[in-house]
Swiss-Prot record:
GO terms for molecular function: chitin binding. Pfam families: Glyco_hydro_18. Residues 22-390 form the GH18 domain. Residues 1-21 form the signal peptide. GO terms for cellular component: cytoplasm; extracellular region. Detected in stratified squamous epithelium in the junctional region between forestomach and glandular stomach (at protein level). Expression is mainly restricted to stomach. It comes from Mus musculus (Mouse). This is Chitinase-like protein 4.
Length: 402
């Protein structure tokens, strides 16, 4: 018995010292600081002990070179990277691209070897100048949205050339190599059109898969934003609109499990019901829901805004089939995630030996704790706890600077 207690104690001690093998990545969006009053979120509001990686969204591109989008970005870079003073194990990445950025600048950049080298050299200079630890390529998407079919191959070429350049720069200067990650699509047709998965998996450090935005108001019926499993109403191609099917596809087609980072949304999609009495999954809708008070985007509510919706009397239902909740009040309907669904997904992630989780975005979690009354960052904290993510070097706590 004494020997068993000793072994158990050593295992616990080693776990505390070495930390989790899972990554917990968190996006910070540059426009979050512009939200009104209690919804405004700045780099100083970030708890430096919460995530293993912070990803700043987004940088831009000009003449095939990476660039900042505003002078304020430069101040944000300094504040974000200053968090590493309080957590020496924290890594920061700069994301380039995004949905609004579109595929055209990427398509032009990858089209010639000269353009690719111009971009790669600019990335190394830029990341080192502003003290980032790596890059997140958020091209939405190679081979789709007007991007030609050849971009599927050229994206792999870019990633291979960039990884090689990062390694050479590291060796030459005797410094840690820059990290290289890519956002990965969550729709099977887009994945097929855009990615040579085995090649990408070999060169990338991580692939952050967008396992969200799987149902939205454009569909004309209610559906969950990020269901873990399929609904009985999901037939045909819709049967793949769930986290389990998407990640399984990536794994089955050549992605290393430990490099797959599962997307966890800190927001939900909202709908206006055609008939308020028909308020389940798959019921007809007429439009997107009204914009949130703070996020001001039609068809979307941040998690902290959803808590207000619930506090106003909305009925919350937990869909045991898809393992995510939805809620409705009158003709308004929202499909989202909460602490319970994050816990279930975290366990599923561990059961499948995946690399970790990425929260999009951190600034839509209840960062102040004043809306949901579940503590600060309740969704992200759930992942931190359930994935056993911690940093022995991090002594600073959340200070909530403005």
């Amino acid at each position: 018995m004494a020997k068993l207690i000793l072994v158990t104690g050593l295992a616990i001690l080693l776990n505390v010292q070495l930390g989790s093998s899972y990554q917990l990545m968190c996006y910070y969006t540059s426009w979050a600081k512009d939200r009104p009053t209690e919804g405004s979120f700045k780099p100083g509001n970030i708890d430096p002990c919460l995530c293993t990686h912070l990803i700043y969204a987004f940088a831009g591109m000009k003449n095939n070179e990476i660039t900042y989008l505003s002078e304020q970005d430069l101040r944000d870079y300094e504040a974000l990277n200053g968090l590493k003073d309080r957590n020496t194990e924290l890594k920061t990445l700069l994301a380039i691209g995004g949905w609004k950025f579109g595929p055209a600048p990427f398509s032009s950049m990858v089209s010639t070897p000269q353009n690719r080298q111009t971009f790669i050299k600019s990335v190394i200079r830029f990341l080192r100048q502003y003290n980032f630890d790596g890059l997140n390529l958020d091209w939405q998407y190679p081979g789709s949205r007007g991007s030609p079919p050849k971009d599927k191959h050229l994206f792999s070429v870019l990633v291979q050339e960039m990884r090689k350049a990062f390694e050479e720069e590291s060796t030459l200067n005797h410094i840690p190599r820059l990290l290289l990650t890519s956002t990965g699509a969550g729709f099977i047709d887009v994945i097929k059109s855009g990615y040579k998965i085995p090649e990408l998996s070999q060169s990338l450090d991580y692939i952050q898969v967008m396992t969200y935005d799987l149902h939205d108001p454009k569909n004309g019926y209610t559906g969950e934003n990020s269901p873990l499993y399929k609904s009985p109403y999901d037939i045909g191609k819709s049967a793949d609109l769930n986290v389990d099917s998407i990640i399984t596809y990536w794994k089955d087609h050549g992605a290393a499990s430990e490099k797959l980072i599962v997307g966890f949304p800190a927001y939900g999609h909202t709908f206006i019901l055609s008939d308020p009495s028909k308020n389940g999954i798959g019921d007809p809708t007429v439009s997107a829901g009204p914009p949130g008070k703070y996020t001001n985007e039609q068809g979307l509510l941040a998690y902290f805004e959803i808590c207000t919706f619930l506090n106003e009397g909305a009925t919350e239902i937990f869909d045991a089939t898809q393992e995510v909740p939805y809620a409705y009040l009158g003709n308004e309907w929202v499909g989202y995630d909460n602490v319970r669904s994050f816990k279930l997904k975290a366990q599923w992630l561990k059961d499948n030996n995946l690399g970790g989780a990425v929260v999009w975005p951190l600034d839509m979690d209840d960062f102040s704790g004043s809306f949901c009354h579940q503590g600060r960052f309740p969704l992200t904290t759930t992942l931190k706890r359930d994935l056993n993510v911690h940093s022995a070097s991090c002594k600073a706590s959340y200070r909530g600077e403005l």
